[in-house]
Amino acid sequence: MANALASATCERCKGGFAPAEKIVNSNGELYHEQCFVCAQCFQQFPEGLFYEFEGRKYCEHDFQMLFAPCCHQCGEFIIGRVIKAMNNSWHPECFRCDLCQEVLADIGFVKNAGRHLCRPCHNREKARGLGKYICQKCHAIIDEQPLIFKNDPYHPDHFNCANCGKELTADARELKGELYCLPCHDKMGVPICGACRRPIEGRVVNAMGKQWHVEHFVCAKCEKPFLGHRHYERKGLAYCETHYNQLFGDVCFHCNRVIEGDVVSALNKAWCVNCFACSTCNTKLTLKNKFVEFDMKPVCKKCYEKFPLELKKRLKKLAETLGRK
């Protein structure tokens, strides 16, 4: 061994080694301690850690600066496994679906409008563009009529009737968390909607002596569902508050709401008691107070007296003209 070291030379400086000198052995290559340094910065390796590239050794910092790619997502250097995709480099944990953030490194991805998406998200985006549903079981596009179960779309043939076991179609019905073919469902005494005449599987609205799907109990004028809000009945039809009063009731000129209770009729308009006030100072008025009309709104006597003389003359003349008609 002594003879071998006597003839050995440093891999870097090609010099020999003193008998008691500390020698660094790296994969069979021998170095003086001061010669075992980074090929770029010529500093010793922190804690002996180095990276080798094309026969040269580098400290971690210089190896990253010279050779390690930067992650397109986080901007950090990538040491270890590199994902090459979309003309960029990524850490495996940084390469994620642009929509759901699922890690794509081991499951693959699909390019979609410049985005990298997992296959389920790609299918959903494709279906949205085609105006179609995505099956929530197999994640494929549903080309035919979907079966809606617990508010999610499915291929009907993924399910069987809970009663007779028959493979289901899009006409299947949900009842208490179970799916039934239409014949079995209709035998169970399910309420029928007064609008569409089809069975009601979920919430039932009881109104006007009938039962309705929530979305089918609507205003006869605007056809918007009431969704639990108050409705008004007239000759067998239901109306929302706004259209009932537009058609049959009084709407306050000031707040544009239905007048509940007493109505103040003034200036050829209807007002809520609390809304009938001076349009200048907001003092509450009654029909017993003196007021004048200005810009189709009431003005109290005190505010009227503050008007310019010329304006008061014109208002008085206008009132006299209207009074003669």
UniProtKB/Swiss-Prot annotation:
Which residue positions does N-acetylalanine occur at?
A: A2
The secretion signal range is: none
What outcome follows a substitution of Q40A? Loss of interaction with ILK and loss of localization to focal adhesions
- Which parts of the sequence belong to the LIM zinc-binding domain? 10-62, 71-121, 135-184, 193-243, 252-303
Topology of the protein relative to the lipid bilayer: Peripheral membrane protein
Extract the SMART domains matched here.
LIM
Mind telling me which residue stretches traverse the membrane in this protein?
A: none
InterPro entries in alphabetical order: LIMS1/2-like_LIM1 (IPR047944), PINCH-1-4-like (IPR017351), PINCH-1/2-like (IPR047946), Znf_LIM (IPR001781)
What does altering F42A do?
Loss of interaction with ILK and loss of localization to focal adhesions
Q: Identify the domain of life.
A: Eukaryota
Q: Which Pfam families match?
A: LIM
**Reported impact of R56A:** Alters interaction with ILK
Taking the record's annotation, the residue ranges forming a coiled coil are none
Consequence of mutating L66D? Answer: Alters interaction with ILK
Q: Which terms in the GO cellular component ontology are assigned?
A: cell-cell junction; cytoplasm; cytosol; focal adhesion; perinuclear region of cytoplasm; plasma membrane
Reported tissue expression: Expressed in most tissues except in the brain.
Where does it localize?
Cell junction, Focal adhesion; Cell membrane
Q: Which GO terms describe its molecular function?
A: actin binding; protein kinase binding; zinc ion binding
Q: How does it assemble?
A: Component of the heterotrimeric IPP (ILK-PINCH-PARVIN) complex composed of ILK, LIMS1/PINCH and PARVA; the complex binds to F-actin via the C-terminal tail of LIMS1 and the N-terminal region of PARVA, promoting F-actin filament bundling. Formation of the IPP complex is dependent on protein kinase C and precedes integrin-mediated cell adhesion and spreading. Competes with LIMS2 for interaction with ILK. Interacts (via LIM zinc-binding 5) with TGFB1I1. Interacts with SH3/SH2 adapter NCK2, thereby linking the complex to cell surface receptors.
Q: PANTHER family this protein is in?
A: LIM AND SENESCENT CELL ANTIGEN-LIKE-CONTAINING DOMAIN PROTEIN 1, LIM DOMAIN-CONTAINING PROTEIN
Q: What is this protein called?
A: LIM and senescent cell antigen-like-containing domain protein 1
Q: Which organism is it from?
A: Homo sapiens
